[in-house]
């Protein structure tokens, strides 16, 4: 959520920065709600001051033995008036929050202005061998097959997945399933053993409050899988009168960014423990509501996929150093696997909802003769923290400040599997195992039918 103080002080700057993302801000509604909020708040504060003054006056009159009945009568009328004003103020504040909950983050000054992925900027690329004439990885020396054609003889089974679950799911068996697991284990070991992340195991189902905090709700509700619970409620909530309350909605996670980042929700952490570095390997569930007919073949865009996520909770003064560090942590996975990649700085129009600055890592897929995203690393600054009320205290005497939250894929396991299959394919249909993965594969050097 955007800083309300910034909106009140410099609304036009906020509007201009949002326009660079292709987003219009409803200034008329904001100004209307804000002016009404100020008016009610002024009236509330005046009534509170009057209540305090009357209480003092009553005390003075009683101390002198004088009649305080008239003042007490006025004082007794105030609670009802004050309650109405406080309810009006709470309603207006809720409407303001609802407006701001659907507004994306402001782009950092270093983010290039643009409308789409065509305006993203390549920062660097890494190739394990000499480039071809066009600057991309050199051709394999034979007609490359895509990961579906390579994988099906080796244990990648889309027909069984479709029978079990429908389109956009995968079923793996044997060596293919082991290679998929090996990739995830390798990524976790690298992030925890060398990059200082703490491995976490998180729930795959979260409540709506958690999703509001990280920004998936309310804007991206259609992208989530809603969970319908059967049977009775094993943890019924009741109000002050003992009446049952409605159960909070629950959803499958679309990324473990949600659960890892939310560890600090409604928390004030000591400044000396920052940065917090967390990682988790989880399945991710996405409805792909807006994907249309894109990437219907294979594993590129699925309803369920695995990902090793990296999250850092940082001091605002160090968050952009942390962003560059996290990009390097994702890059190291690709380097160790020997996969060609490039780093792209996303433009304002291509960034995610909560991001202030994002780098995408794109891996080379020979069969498509193109680069495809395999990791996205973002600094959300205080955007999520403000929604979650996640703060830190620099020292015992300091006021709490909002932390900065960062997240990134380290990496998407399924897409890494695709990249390994396509880049390490051999003309005879076998696939060489990258050296970094061989310890996880029992020393196997290649997959073959």
UniProtKB/Swiss-Prot annotation:
NCBIfam families per record: serS
Family, as annotated: Belongs to the class-II aminoacyl-tRNA synthetase family. Type-1 seryl-tRNA synthetase subfamily.
Record's protein name: Serine--tRNA ligase
Pathway given in the UniProt record: Aminoacyl-tRNA biosynthesis; selenocysteinyl-tRNA(Sec) biosynthesis; L-seryl-tRNA(Sec) from L-serine and tRNA(Sec): step 1/1
Enzyme Commission (EC) number: 6.1.1.11
Compartment(s) where it occurs, according to its Swiss-Prot or TrEMBL record: Cytoplasm
Domain comment as written in the entry: Consists of two distinct domains, a catalytic core and a N-terminal extension that is involved in tRNA binding.
Database matches in Pfam families: Seryl_tRNA_N, tRNA-synt_2b
Catalytic activity: tRNA(Ser) + L-serine + ATP = L-seryl-tRNA(Ser) + AMP + diphosphate + H(+); tRNA(Sec) + L-serine + ATP = L-seryl-tRNA(Sec) + AMP + diphosphate + H(+)
Amino acids binding ATP: 286-288, 373-376
Keyword annotations of the record: Aminoacyl-tRNA synthetase, ATP-binding, Cytoplasm, Ligase, Nucleotide-binding, Protein biosynthesis
InterPro entries: aa-tRNA-synt_IIb (IPR002314), aa-tRNA-synth_II (IPR006195), aa-tRNA-synth_II/BPL/LPL (IPR045864), Ser-tRNA-ligase_type_1 (IPR002317), Ser-tRNA-synth_1_N (IPR015866), SerRS_1_N_sf (IPR042103), SerRS_core (IPR033729), tRNA-bd_arm (IPR010978)
This protein's record includes keyword Lipid metabolism: no
